[in-house]
């Protein structure tokens, strides 16, 4: 409440000084715009980075720093999110997409001048796998051969509460591994890396753009130790220059193979106590960009008219999973009826205050993706009351007669309660189906999910990649436990919550125990509908108009390589000056 009040007062003060009421001219930018004379990018990114290690980076600002100082086999084009060459100049698939060969460039160097080799990638990936649950995104390597493991003796730890980081595995915990194949990443030479996968993945080059796949230079194999900034060797466009309690300063890397294309001389991650101080720094001209600030719906509405305010769909999905082990939710007609009776546009607009985007499919749309093929239905879950009632009648429940009360399980969270009540009202209005809303604290909620004590349950995921197989297997596959991003998704919409509080909120996402055919594609997921998407989160940024190349995307993963300060930027002519002419 205190943080929310402070934000409201901050905006009220800002608007009154700027003369931004409805009957006055609205300034185009939020705060002072003074073009810097140097190529230094000052970035308030939700706090200061807490780790410099690709294996331990869970979320921004840690992942943003890792992307700046380390480079992987591929990188994302920040606009299209297509994989582009990085350390690897080219790659090729064989064996139906189960084997990938990457060819490394000759001029890739570490910051000490040493050559970046294929073996660096092998050792780094093996280190991450050995870290297990200590590394927040180890599961992204799960499709590589030789990473399989089978739990025995001990029970699985519960997913951490949103207010707590995951606990390291107990030393008394026993884990038995199945007889393993050799590790699937192999250095055929210094310049050639071959990777064997458990399942075909034609989008694997997109997956390895994730920070967890970026190599580190290790003199000794110490898997449990985090890399420290002092003396850190890196291979990216920037290297660590200075660190203290108020900032992290990066400098353009002199040994980077593509340094001629890097305009920025330095990047400064600027610390901020909270959202209010970050916005105040931006308004006064102290920083060039603000991202990962916990903005309330009111603040979002007040910022929306400004030209330098950006809003982008973020790949954090809230979805509802059906317990298909229970009748009548084992009937696809029932699941589809419930799915298309929901007005997702209204949920996003009314129930979340316009702070989310309606999710009518499981994966956020990217600019270059091919259309989905869905048998006998639309590839989007559009509201269709007539078809929903028809499907329910075909399933034996005309006008909802004799349909059991739906037990809808959600974790204790005000926004999730409001959304669940709205969806329950839609089911009652369209299908004449009643709902019992079951709200539980986090531990009890997770226990109910594990035991299957629900008909429908609210879940969440923060997608780490555009790789379709990885995202869909995270949602639906036994071998891909994924992340318990319900807590992260909630954090994005909780007033007063800061991004740095949630950097480690990743753990296994529980699934209903019923055995079902494997789902590897979004088209299969839309055909099966064992779960239904509800909404995507949104990410927000304030970026000064003289900053170019800072592109937002659904992964919330901007690249610094093409960012520059346009020293020749001039404000557009105001309507008043045009009329004077």
Name each model feature, range by range.
Residues 43-95, 126, 230-234:
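N-terminal lobe/hinge region of extracytoplasmic solute-binding protein
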Residues 89-140, 194-196, 281, 328:
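Aromatic- and charge-enriched surface segment that lines or borders ligand/interaction sites
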Residues 153-182, 191, 199-266, 274-276, ...:
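Gly/Pro-rich hinge or "lid" segments in bacterial periplasmic/extracellular proteins
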Residues 245, 393-464, 539:
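Ligand/substrate-recognition segments at binding pockets and active sites
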Residues 176, 186, 381, 433-450, ...:
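Extracytoplasmic/peripheral linker and loop segments enriched in polar/acidic and small residues
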Residues 241-249, 268-326, 349:
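Extracellular/periplasmic solute-recognition and catalytic clefts
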Residues 45-64, 87-88, 114, 137, ...:
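A structural "hinge/loop" feature
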Residues 357-395, 412-418:
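Structural transition elements
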């Amino acid at each position: 409440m205190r943080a929310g009040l402070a934000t409201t007062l901050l905006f009220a003060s800002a608007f009154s000084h700027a003369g931004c009421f409805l009957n006055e001219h609205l300034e185009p930018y939020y705060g002072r715009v003074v073009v810097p004379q140097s190529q230094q990018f000052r970035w308030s990114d939700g706090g200061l980075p807490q780790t410099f290690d690709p294996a331990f980076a869970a979320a921004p600002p840690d992942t943003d720093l890792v992307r700046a100082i380390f480079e992987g086999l591929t990188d994302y084009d920040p606009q299209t999110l297509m994989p582009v060459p990085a350390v690897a100049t080219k790659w090729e698939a064989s064996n139906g997409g189960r084997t990938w060969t990457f060819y490394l460039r000759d001029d890739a160097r570490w910051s000490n001048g040493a050559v970046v080799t294929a073996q660096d990638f092998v050792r780094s990936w093996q280190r991450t796998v050995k870290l297990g649950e200590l590394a927040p995104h180890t599961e992204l390597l799960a499709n590589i051969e030789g990473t399989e493991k089978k739990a025995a003796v001990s029970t699985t730890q519960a997913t951490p509460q949103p207010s707590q980081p995951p606990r390291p595995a107990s030393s008394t915990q026993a884990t038995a591994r199945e007889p393993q194949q050799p590790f699937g990443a192999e250095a055929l030479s210094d310049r050639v890396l071959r990777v064997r996968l458990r399942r075909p993945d034609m989008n694997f080059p997109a997956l390895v753009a994730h920070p967890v796949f970026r190599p580190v230079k290790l003199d000794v194999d110490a898997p449990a130790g985090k890399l420290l900034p002092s003396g850190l060797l890196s291979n990216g466009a920037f290297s660590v220059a200075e660190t203290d309690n108020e900032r992290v300063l990066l400098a353009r890397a002199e040994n980077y193979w593509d340094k001629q294309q890097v305009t920025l001389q330095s990047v400064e991650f600027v610390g901020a106590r909270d959202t209010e101080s970050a916005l105040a720094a931006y308004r006064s001209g102290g920083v060039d960009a603000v991202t990962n600030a916990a903005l309330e719906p009111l603040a979002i509405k007040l910022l929306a008219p400004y030209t330098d305010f950006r809003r982008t769909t973020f790949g954090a999905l809230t979805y509802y999973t059906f317990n298909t082990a229970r009748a009548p939710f084992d009937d696809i007609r029932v699941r589809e009826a419930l799915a298309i009776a929901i007005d997702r546009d209204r949920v996003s607009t009314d129930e979340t205050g316009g702070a989310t985007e309606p999710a009518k499919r499981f994966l956020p749309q990217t600019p270059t993706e091919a259309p989905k093929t869905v048998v006998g239905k639309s590839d989007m879950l559009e509201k269709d009351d007539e078809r929903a009632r028809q499907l329910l009648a075909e399933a034996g429940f005309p006008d909802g007669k004799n349909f059991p009360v739906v037990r809808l399980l959600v974790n204790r969270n005000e926004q999730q309660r409001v959304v669940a009540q709205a969806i329950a009202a839609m089911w009652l209005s369209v299908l004449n189906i009643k709902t019992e809303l079951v709200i539980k604290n986090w531990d009890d909620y997770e226990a109910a999910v594990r035991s299957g004590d629900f008909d429908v349950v609210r879940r969440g995921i923060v997608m780490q990649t555009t790789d379709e197989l990885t995202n869909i297997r995270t949602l639906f596959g036994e071998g891909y436990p994924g992340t318990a991003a319900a807590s992260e998704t909630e954090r994005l919409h909780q007033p007063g919550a800061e991004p740095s509080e949630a950097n480690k909120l990743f753990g296994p996402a529980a699934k209903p125990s019923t055995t079902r055919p494997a789902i590897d594609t979004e088209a299969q997921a839309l055909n099966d509908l064992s779960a239904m998407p509800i909404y995507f989160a949104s990410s927000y940024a304030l970026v000064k108009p003289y900053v170019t190349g800072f592109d937002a995307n659904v992964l919330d993963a901007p690249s610094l390589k093409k960012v520059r300060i346009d020293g020749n930027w001039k404000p557009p002519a105001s309507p008043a000056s045009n009329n004077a002419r």
